[in-house]
Amino acid sequence: MGVKFLKILVCGLFFWSLNAHLWGKQDNSFLGVAEKAYKSGNYSKATSYFKKACNDGVSEGCTQLGIIYENGQGTRIDYKKALEYYKTACQADDREGCFGLGGLYDEGLGTTQNYQEAIDAYAKACVLKHPESCYNLGIIYDRKIKGNADQAVTYYQKSCNFDMAKGCYVLGVAYEKGFLEVKQSNHKAVIYYLKACRLDDGQACRALGSLFENGDAGLDEDFEVAFDYLQKACGLNNSGGCASLGSMYMLGRYVKKDPQKAFNFFKQACDMGSAVSCSRMGFMYSQGDAVPKDLRKALDNYERGCDMGDEVGCFALAGMYYNMKDKENAIMIYDKGCKLGMKQACENLTKLRGY
């Protein structure tokens, strides 16, 4: 009787093991087909197979459905469906699902904005070692729920520990400026900037370049090191890094003066949104410096700089309109330059208005 029972038990366990093995393979098969279809842009087929995987308990399938409905890939955007699929995935300890869920609560998409729900979802993902969720928790405690600076620092630190460059950079700024209620520490600021820059954060490389260029934060002036960091920042599409390199070449500061290189760096920076670089291009076109003199291009670039908030660009643009006998535009642009804080623009505005 005991032997017979043992045989039944062994056969039962074998059957259960085989069934579980086959069931797992079926899940993986669904997921594999779905992922292949998704990569090829066949979202209809991908959705169908992700649903099969999700229904069979494969959390990745649920997460992918959340992504599909959140972004409207092959279907209309449906945040409510995305929310439900992310919830299912998060309940199964899928960190990407928790991250997606946190994002919807954070932004109030498909549901009422709820920072506490966002915190709960992000916190679970953070525990599951999801760097961006830790970082987003830092953002919430830093900027959205006031009076939680210590929590913000804690989660920025966790994201940095997980090699999230943005988290390291924010901590660098905090220690350099004494923000987030931390004790100002140049030493710590440099350590965090260095890590962030090694992780290819352009802002951090730009910050290091400035510190070495000016001998700030207890660092000795080292123009060669500064140049290298600024060059890396520019290569990482940081407009400030490119703008600084442009200034170096324009003025011949620490490098041989080279107006053409200066112009090229200013153009890069301007195209990335550096207002002052657009204005400097305007000046170079107005003077014919490294480029043929072209007042139309000068005006266009001053206008770009002014539109992005550079008071010098506004002042120069207003001057061009004045010289073109366009008093109305000159007054309007001087007024803008004045509001941006340029005293001379205010003085010229007063003269043009006659009071």
UniProtKB/Swiss-Prot annotation:
SMART domains: SEL1 (SM00671)
One example of a Gene Ontology biological process annotation: response to antibiotic
Coiled coil, from the record: none
Gene of this entry: hcpE
E.C. designation(s): 3.5.2.6
Organism: Helicobacter pylori (strain ATCC 700392 / 26695)
Similarity field: Belongs to the hcp beta-lactamase family.
Cystine crosslinks: C54-C62, C90-C98, C126-C134, C160-C168, C197-C205, C234-C242, C270-C278, C306-C314, C338-C346
Main localization category: secreted
A Pfam cross-reference name: Sel1
GO cellular component, as recorded: extracellular region
The protein, known as: Putative beta-lactamase HcpE
Top-rank lineage group of the source organism: Bacteria
Job description of the protein: May hydrolyze 6-aminopenicillinic acid and 7-aminocephalosporanic acid (ACA) derivatives.
Residue windows of the TPR repeats: 27-60, 63-96, 98-131, 132-166, 202-240, 245-275, 276-311, 312-344
Signal peptide boundaries: 1-22
